[in-house]
Regions:
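Active-site-adjacent structural segments surrounding the nucleophilic cysteine of cysteine proteases
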Residues: 78-89
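Active-site nucleophilic cysteine motif
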Residues: 91-109
Length: 207
């Protein structure tokens, strides 16, 4: 067995952990069997966070967690775990992000299962070529003619930091949106002028 180091590319590396997809791909290319992922908690216990559980589910491997403060180990394995709440989730690409929180809202509030959409394994690949405009119609969301007549449950396609349509939020009524930005916690926020101007397209679910 060997240990293959991978970079943490999260913006806040003290609070978040995100594997570098290029390092991960290089590890896979070596041809050996991947047994799991090892990472540390600088402060606090080795108890798996929701982000650890979500990451383990997403990549399909155990997470071995070491607490630097307490000098202890823990492990979490894929088991079908899902985040218990729509609010306060840690961001994990493909498992807890802007799209999955919308899918989970539809399941929890309307008992609607949005079909699985196969996305790139890394956020970097997705940001280079966002696919929401092509995927939403295939998932039974109809594009609306205007962005100023939104209703509860509408998906708002927004311009991201790279000037591409790479972020989605859900309008939940009362001038509020539910969304999950990269490397932040999922939250409800006021649909203010900044978000209104960022919204370029609106999609409505039509069974």
């Amino acid at each position: 067995e060997i240990f293959w180091p991978c970079k943490n590319i999260a913006e806040d590396q003290f609070e978040f952990f995100a594997l570098d997809p290029e390092d991960w791909a290089e590890c896979e290319d070596k041809g050996g069997e991947i047994l799991g992922v090892v990472h540390s908690h600088p402060v606090g216990s080795s108890e798996p966070s929701d982000g650890d559980r979500a990451s383990s589910e997403y990549i399909g491997y155990p997470y071995h967690i070491y607490s630097v403060e307490h000098k202890s180990w823990n492990i979490v394995k894929p088991s079908g775990w899902k985040a218990p709440s729509l609010i306060g989730r840690r961001w994990v690409w493909g498992q807890q992000d802007c799209w999955t929180v919308i899918c989970d809202w539809f399941k929890e509030t309307k008992n609607i299962d949005i079909p699985y959409w196969h996305r790139p394994k890394s956020i970097k690949s997705f940001l280079n070529s966002p696919e929401f405009q092509y995927a939403l119609p295939k998932l039974k969301f109809q594009k609306q003619e205007t962005t100023d007549k939104i209703k509860k449950g509408d998906v708002l396609l927004m311009m991201g930091p790279r000037k591409k349509l790479s972020h989605v939020a859900l309008y939940i009524g009362d001038q509020l949106i539910l969304h999950h930005e990269a490397n932040k916690l999922s939250c409800r926020e006021l649909y203010d002028l900044g978000y209104i101007e960022a919204t370029k397209e609106v999609y409505r679910y039509a069974a």
